[in-house]
Curated annotation (Swiss-Prot):
Top-rank taxon, per record: Bacteria
Pfam family membership, one: MMR_HSR1
Name under which the protein is recorded: GTPase Der
Quaternary context: Associates with the 50S ribosomal subunit.
SS bond list: none
Domain EngA-type G: 3-167, 179-352
Role noted for this protein: GTPase that plays an essential role in the late steps of ribosome biogenesis.
Domain KH-like: 353-437
Organism: Xanthomonas euvesicatoria pv. vesicatoria (strain 85-10)
GO biological process, one term: ribosome biogenesis
GO terms for MF: ATP hydrolysis activity; GTP binding; ribosome binding
Residues reported in the UniProt entry to bind GTP 1: 9-16, 57-61, 119-122
Keyword Nucleotide-binding found: yes
Key words of the record: GTP-binding, Nucleotide-binding, Repeat, Ribosome biogenesis
Length: 465
């Protein structure tokens, strides 16, 4: 599992601002008023591609154990108990408070690895602020201003040095011969029914009540001589609907399952179309770069007119992922199962294919000659060579010059060209563009003795006039 980092502290110290900076999102609501965050909010930090980790933002601990404040404090304590690393966030402008002292006391009882993060140091004397918190006795202290993104890199370095390679808990199977498939979607779209159908037994609890599955459950399957690990995840609800602590943990487990799987099967309900919740889940899959198959459930119960309407809606809402195969199924009656597995195989094969440097360079050369980059304000990008940068998703690293002016339309052209040439289906394709470092940039070109003498003669001629 991915390591888990928890942000803990009293209200209004900037935990949500740090969360947004680490996850490059605005998922956490930020406001000067204390107590805006109440539940746990999970996201994935990929600022360091070598070691992504899950971040959990918690509500401020106000010291009151009654009512809403008490529930918020319990959520924060639960998050800290799950975490591989705790970031104890304090306010550098206001200084240490008695509430900070109380939080530190129970953090020490918890005995989790902890880093002190002093936020809001902009406009202050950093040394003075650090000395005020020195009495807490932390050897690991990061001072930053999350609102201005000052010190975020230092925080990442500190987190990276303290995190284990894998988080606590049971690891998902990493057997290369076993295809890991995560079934994700909104509550009650039929994920557990589908897994039960594939297994031939009622292994998962399936019910018409949304939210029956609360945890991610992994089971092994052998089908047609191939090994699979099927991961049935809890349905992801809209944030406003996720209230119970156990459902917060379910959302966390679903994110972990997406990160650890090789193929994500996004299940949609043919009777409801594509909703905002579906788009949110799809966004999590694309962020993780996982192979994708769209399974449209309850298709058998639709009339011809309803099917035509659903097809039109799918083409409009999911047109931007037209590289993913869509399979029409009935989890209840078992129709479409063979087509579903065939789509999973194609997506998995494309996502995990290993490319040679020679074949991708040949593809880049043909793409470049067929359609060279356009001139942008007199500058033309030059693509010199490319090499594979990894799999799942297939990644290609392109080296050249003036790549900053390479238009997005040309990047899409390259993606489509590589997809067509290598028959890549069901997987995102990523390109990373890198410019070579010019060793002479910013340096003056020294003149030879002959050039210096000529320059002097010219200057005398100019002055003589």
């Amino acid at each position: 599992m991915l390591p888990l980092v928890a942000l803990v502290g009293r209200p209004n110290v900037g935990k949500s601002t740090i969360f947004n900076a680490l996850t490059r999102t605005r998922d956490a609501l930020v406001h000067d008023q204390p107590g805006v965050t109440r539940d746990r909010n999970y996201g994935v930090c990929r600022l360091d591609e070598q070691q992504p980790f899950i971040v959990v933002d918690t509500g401020g601990i106000a010291g009151d154990e009654e009512g809403l404040a008490g529930a918020t404090a319990r959520q924060a304590r639960a998050a800290a108990g799950e975490a591989d690393l705790v970031l104890f966030v304090v306010d550098g402008r206001e200084g240490a408070s008695s509430l900070d002292d109380e939080i530190l006391a129970w953090l020490r009882k918890l005995a989790r690895p902890t880093v002190l993060v002093i936020n809001k140091i902009d406009g202050t004397d950093e040394e003075t602020v650090r000395s005020e918190f020195a009495r807490y006795g932390f050897s690991d202290v990061v001072a930053l201003s999350a609102a201005h993104r000052q010190g975020i890199d230092e925080l990442l370095d500190e987190v990276g040095a303290r995190l284990p390679e894998e988080g606590a808990g049971e690891l998902l199977d990493n057997d290369p011969a076993r295809v890991r498939i995560a079934f994700v979607g909104r509550p009650n779209v039929g994920k557990s029914t589908l897994v039960n159908r594939l297994l031939g037994e009622e292994r998962m609890i399936a019910s018409e009540v949304p939210g029956t599955t609360r945890d991610s459950i992994a089971v092994d399957l052998e089908r047609d001589g191939r090994q699979y690990r099927l991961i049935d995840t809890a349905g992801l609800r809209r944030r406003g609907k996720v209230e119970e602590a156990v459902e917060k943990f379910s959302a966390f487990k679903t994110l972990q399952a997406i990160e650890q799987c090789q193929v994500a099967v996004l299940m949609l309900d043919a009777t409801e179309g594509v909703t905002d919740q579906d788009a949110t889940i799809l966004g999590a899959i694309l962020d993780a770069g996982r192979a994708l198959v769209v399974a449209i459930n309850k298709w058998d119960g639709q009339s011809d007119y309803q099917r035509a309407q659903a097809e039109d809606l799918l083409s409009r809402k999911l047109g931007f992922v037209n590289w993913a195969e869509a399979v029409r199924i009935s989890a209840l009656h078992g129709s479409g199962m063979r087509e579903l597995f065939q789509a999973i195989h194609r997506a998995h094969a494309s996502a995990t294919h290993e490319f040679s440097t020679s074949e991708v360079n040949q593809a880049l050369e043909i793409a470049y000659e067929t359609n060279p980059p356009p001139s942008i304000r007199g500058h033309v990008s030059k693509l010199r060579y490319v090499h594979p940068g990894g799999a799942n998703p297939p990644t290609f690293i392109v080296h050249g010059t003036r790549l900053k002016v390479l238009p997005e339309s040309y990047k899409r052209y390259l993606e489509n060209f590589f997809r067509k040439r290598f028959k890549l289906v069901g997987t995102p394709v990523r390109f990373i563009f890198r410019e070579g470092v010019n060793p002479y940039e910013g340096k003056k070109n020294p003149l030879s003795d002959r050039q210096v003498a000529r320059k002097r003669r010219l200057m005398r001629h100019v002055k003589g006039k």
